[in-house]
Amino acid sequence: MSRKPPAAVARQLRQEAGFGCCACGLPIIQYHHIVEWAGDQHFRAQDMMVLCPLHHDQATKGAMPEAEQRRFKANPCNIQRGLAQGLLKVSQDYCAANFGSVTIVGEGPFVRIDGENIQSFHIGPGNLEISLRLFSKTDELLLEIDRNEWISGDPLPWDIEADWQKLTLRESSRQISVSLNAKPVPVELKGELWRGGKRASLDARGIHIDGATYPFGIEELALVGIVLNIDTGKLSFGASPQNPYAVIVSWPDRRERLWKARDKWREIKAKVLSADAR
């Protein structure tokens, strides 16, 4: 039997905790069984809570007694601070990030390296949800996050910092890091990653592999519902599997181009929802 809670239970636990760890408010969470799973394979929301990976590790190893767990559950950090929608609260209904002068707008995978979805974005119930797959220099999968849920990986080597609309994950040796600032739109995104034994850097200037900048061959465009595909030899772009109606928006003014891309994304999303309903 899978330990992953049903969607309705998971949603209730996230909402009651203010979309963050009950103990500290971090937006990257795991689902914790206060009444231990080993003795009772249950999904009772009253006996579960959400914790960040480090507090979850403490709780499962006995360093956080049940009474303390229940105090955190009854008084979640974000709720006490008036952050009912968590630290990654956003008001927009779309995701956008800049890579050089190119803006990607949509939801789902934004960057894929050597066939792996490295970075994805979604809009949750008023908050930004990120997905990450981060690899070591030897191409070992170090961590996986799916829509703000820590799926796999040892949390101890990682420094996770969060502030209002900001999130940083940094590996202890500082060889790998990802940070985002969701205050501006498009979001500001930076990353120092490894894939296939090569170092990949992502920032507002573009994408760099082992120090060499990857030319897009395009400038001053918005890619709507499109994912960047990177391998060790080339960079390309194409429709995300989730967004078959992808388009490219060309407009001289960057702010107006973003608005036009946003409107196109809303049209695409309506088409996808309509097709799924058939």
Predicted regions, residues:
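Histidine-centered nuclease catalytic patch
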Residues: 2-77
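Extended charged
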Residues: 72-278
